Amino acid sequence: MTLMNCDPATGSCRIPDAAPTLPQGAKQAPGGEVTLRYIGDPMCSWCWGISSTLEELARYCEQKGIGFTLTMGGLRAGGGDAWGPEFREFLRREWTHIAKVTGQPFGFSLLSAKHFDHDTEPACRAVVVAEQMLDQKRPVASATLAFFSAVQRKFYVEGEDPKNVDFYRSICEDASLSFEDFRAHFATAAARQAVYRQFAQCGEWGVRAFPTLLLDLAGDLKQLSSGATTAASLIERIEHLLDARID
């Protein structure tokens, strides 16, 4: 399976079937009684497409006292399709379509590069490292989502390479994080292990496509959406599930 399994109708991209999984029985992650769980990848084009939707949802959750978490999915951890004319043309069509549907900006300078390794693991790892460093901030979820969105923008609009650690210098500065501390942690085995644990959690949840949103009701996971969606429809679905829980 390749990155070309992006569905313009549903607004989602699927991960390879060989994704890692956790042992049976590890069905839920720690969190509050009610938590909205966003599963995505900074280098998933449809995840960038719904960036404004996620920002609105994060604000809604904060106002309602609902937990909000990000879990990295590893769309193409380890690398993707060969960087040839066919794949670059696929990306051009896909990004053009997503821009038209969602209004999100895309730059196309990256598609002029002769060589590029579409490995999404480093970008996912960067978000995990940032979240660990942001742990002293409140609210952590909003700060992590802002970092995630900044990585997306720098990749999709500015066309820079998230595998290069210097890619994150300005993003760390904007987030008031020490870039030198980030750089040191980013290169560690512990950081790689942490991001692969998140990939494995996605597999255990049965998440195979991004973006996906789950509502965790004290360990009872309800899928809200898989693919492009709107904040209004998601909020309606959340409130319906919460009302049903009260009844």
Predicted regions and their residues:
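Local sequence-structure signature of Cys/Sec-based thiol-disulfide redox active-site neighborhoods
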Residues: 28-56, 67, 71-74
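Structural alpha/beta surface segment adjacent to cysteine/selenocysteine redox centers
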Residues: 51-155
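A short beta-strand-turn-helix
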Residues: 14-34
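C-terminal cap of thioredoxin/glutaredoxin-like
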Residues: 2-16, 20, 39, 43, ...
